[in-house]
């Protein structure tokens, strides 16, 4: 009986420790009290990358989107390093095609405290900076801490400009000007092709079959004489 109780307690402690080694990040995008529309929600995402030391074979990565129209999002069941005072670091990148968001990079720290609890910290960590302040610098720039409870807040910097992802660097003569105007209109293009055919066809016939070309010219002259004779007789 006693051995069974010990086994149950051991199993409970193992489950509790395994649960403690998992973290959760809750965040919210604040759009100035505006609801998140379906269009915006599909074009906004949050990416998470594990950095520094990690206990798994590969660093953890994940991407999430909004949970509701209030801008809430969450990363759950995140792997954490084992041991007292051990820390686990993640970097989160908010991204949107409709808005410029701030901060554009967030350093997130999980720390296992001696009393068995898990401490969560977050810091603003903008592009162009190192993930951590360098220890080699006498007075390193400190990262600005962020509020993590009840969630990490991502704010709207301003609406993003309309982006043109494809731009023709060198516009050819076939796209602009007189040539481009003709090529972009099927009726004008058909007229030009017909005119070229009327000019080129007699030349080709004369080169390939001189007798036929001569007969065509004689027939044209005959019809012209008959036309003039008919006019003169009137």
Curated annotation (Swiss-Prot):
It is a single-pass type I membrane protein. GO terms for biological process: endoplasmic reticulum to Golgi vesicle-mediated transport; protein transport. The chain crosses the membrane at residues 189-209. It comes from the Eukaryota. Glycans are attached at residues 35, 53, 85, 115, 170. Residues 210-234 are cytoplasmic. InterPro entries: Sop4. The keyword Acetylation does not apply. Keywords: Endoplasmic reticulum, Glycoprotein, Membrane, Protein transport, Signal, Transmembrane, Transmembrane helix, Transport. One of its GO terms (cellular component) is endoplasmic reticulum membrane. Residues 19-188 are lumenal. It is found in: Endoplasmic reticulum membrane. Residues 1-18 form the signal peptide. Present with 11700 molecules/cell in log phase SD medium. Involved in the export of PMA1, possibly through the monitoring or assisting of PMA1 folding and acquisition of competence to enter vesicles. Belongs to the SOP4 family. This is Protein SOP4. It comes from Saccharomyces cerevisiae (strain ATCC 204508 / S288c). The gene is SOP4.
């Amino acid at each position: 009986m006693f051995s069974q109780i010990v086994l149950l307690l051991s199993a409970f402690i193992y489950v509790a420790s395994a649960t403690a080694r998992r973290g959760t990040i809750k965040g919210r995008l604040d759009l100035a009290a505006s609801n998140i529309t379906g269009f915006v929600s599909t074009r906004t995402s949050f990416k998470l990358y594990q950095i520094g030391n990690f206990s798994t074979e590969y660093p953890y990565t994940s991407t999430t989107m909004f949970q509701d129209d209030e801008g809430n999002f969450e990363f759950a069941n995140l792997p954490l390093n084992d041991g007292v005072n051990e820390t686990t670091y993640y970097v989160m990148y908010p991204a949107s095609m409709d808005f410029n968001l701030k901060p554009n990079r967030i350093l997130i720290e999980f720390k296992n405290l001696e009393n068995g609890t898990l401490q969560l910290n977050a810091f603003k960590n903008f592009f162009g900076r190192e993930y951590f302040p360098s220890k080699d610098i006498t007075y390193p720039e400190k990262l600005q801490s962020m509020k993590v409870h009840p969630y990490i807040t991502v704010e709207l910097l301003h609406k993003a400009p309309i982006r043109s992802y494809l731009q023709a660097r060198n516009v050819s003569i076939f796209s602009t000007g007189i040539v481009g105007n003709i090529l972009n209109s099927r009726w004008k293009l058909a007229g030009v092709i017909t005119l070229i055919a009327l000019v080129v066809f007699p030349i080709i016939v004369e080169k390939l079959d001189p007798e036929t070309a001569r007969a065509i010219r004689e027939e044209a002259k005959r019809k012209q004489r008959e036309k003039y004779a008919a006019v003169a007789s009137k």
